[in-house]
């Protein structure tokens, strides 16, 4: 499995600010979107382009345009919505596929409760967005849904990832690609990432 920990100074700086305990909802939300945008920049670096001739201000001009598979952004509800706008800044024409998952706090297993995928997802590259890759359960279950629907080109974008989640994802779906702003220390006894970001969903939506 391709694993990319983005080490760009802007990514590290912005993620560091997100770890502050008393960060405001507004600031956390802004930074989640900004880091999501930067991760998208990295995740789409291998997109193919083709030459196209357009009419410029002084006559015909040859330009590069992206070709190949179109993109669907797949936020995992609810926290994934916090990264979606940042992703769309780079790929504004992408279609949105939504998957709802929550984690059973006793078993730590993902529980699906909603899905609405674009009709031609088998023709698109999927960018799954979720702030945290902890145990990996929610992301793995989402990939299961996408593959069942015919999607074969999948990349996962997360703000922070635990080694345990990475290992589980690689075992279940070695053909996907993972892009993260940080590979953190690991999980505590409750399945939360250390040092992590706390509850990203609560911080994005201002709930507790």
Swiss-Prot record:
Family: Belongs to the UPRTase family.
Activity regulation note: Allosterically activated by GTP.
Purpose: Catalyzes the conversion of uracil and 5-phospho-alpha-D-ribose 1-diphosphate (PRPP) to UMP and diphosphate.
One Pfam family it belongs to: UPRTase
Induction, as annotated: By pyrimidine starvation.
Cofactor remark: Binds 1 Mg(2+) ion per subunit. The magnesium is bound as Mg-PRPP.
Pathway membership: Pyrimidine metabolism; UMP biosynthesis via salvage pathway; UMP from uracil: step 1/1
SUPFAM superfamilies associated with the record: PRTase-like (SSF53271)
Keywords: Allosteric enzyme, Glycosyltransferase, GTP-binding, Magnesium, Nucleotide-binding, Transferase
Catalytic activity, EC: 2.4.2.9
Superkingdom, taxonomy of origin: Bacteria
GO terms under cellular component: cytoplasm; cytosol; membrane
An MF annotation (GO) of this entry: magnesium ion binding
Phenotypic consequence of residue 131 to D: 60-fold reduction of the catalytic rate, and large decrease in uracil-binding affinity
Catalytic activity: UMP + diphosphate = 5-phospho-alpha-D-ribose 1-diphosphate + uracil
InterPro entries: PRibTrfase_dom (IPR000836), PRTase-like (IPR029057), Upp_B (IPR034332), UPRTase/APRTase (IPR050054), Ura_phspho_trans (IPR005765)
Subunit-structure text: Homodimer or homotrimer in the absence of substrates, and homopentamer or homohexamer in the presence of substrates.
Residues that hold 5-phospho-alpha-D-ribose 1-diphosphate according to the record: 78, 103, 130-138, 199
Sites where the protein binds uracil: 193, 198-200
Biological process annotations from GO: pyrimidine nucleobase metabolic process; UMP salvage; uracil salvage
Name recorded for this polypeptide: Uracil phosphoribosyltransferase
Requisite cofactors: Mg(2+)
Native source species: Escherichia coli (strain K12)
